[in-house]
Amino acid sequence: MARNVLYPLYQLGGPQLRVFRTNFFIQLVRPGTAQPEDTVQFRIPMEMTRVDLRNYLERIYNVPVAAVRTRVQHGSHRKRDHRNVRIKKPDYKVAYVQLAHGQTFTFPDLFPEKDPRLEGSSVDEAQSTFMADEQQRQGSDPQRGGVPNWFSL
């Protein structure tokens, strides 16, 4: 699952406790098209296999997995640099994980839509309070005894 795993040397009498950390990073991606509720889409490294992903999710995150399907998404090469040479984005692997029976996943709504009616009233209130504060600030100071503000040090 992990590349270049170096285990510590064996020492007599010492316990062989090992913490296994992977050097794989997976990204949970919002699907572009509608998918069933039990299917989750990930973006994974090219070296990671479907068995690795299944073990990763089951052992580290305790997520029961029914099936894993993968495909390779080729990076686009439409962009060109200052020398008119094509620049290719790197390829990546997309994995579709089907969760076990009864498990569902819905992508969280991180930025909910705001009600425009509530937004407009708060803007009007903020503008009216701002104008009241400005008028109070620009009014004459009673301690100056009628002397204008421009006539000061």
UniProtKB/Swiss-Prot annotation:
GO cellular component, one term: mitochondrial large ribosomal subunit
PANTHER family associated with the record: LARGE RIBOSOMAL SUBUNIT PROTEIN UL23M, RIBOSOMAL PROTEIN L23-RELATED
Any GO BP annotation: mitochondrial translation
Subunit structure: Component of the mitochondrial ribosome large subunit (39S) which comprises a 16S rRNA and about 50 distinct proteins.
SUPFAM superfamilies, sorted: Ribosomal proteins S24e, L23 and L15e
UniProt cross-references to InterPro entries, sorted A to Z: Nucleotide-bd_a/b_plait_sf, Ribosomal_uL23-like, Ribosomal_uL23/eL15/eS24_sf
Record gene name: MRPL23
Gene3D superfamilies per the UniProt record, alphabetical: 3.30.70.330
The family this protein is said to belong to: Belongs to the universal ribosomal protein uL23 family.
Keyword Secreted: no
Keyword vocabulary terms for this entry: Mitochondrion, Ribonucleoprotein, Ribosomal protein
Protein name per UniProt: Large ribosomal subunit protein uL23m
Pfam families given in the database record: Ribosomal_L23
Gene Ontology MF, one: structural constituent of ribosome
Localization (cell): Mitochondrion
Predominant subcellular localization, coarse grouping: mitochondrion
Region (Disordered): 131-153
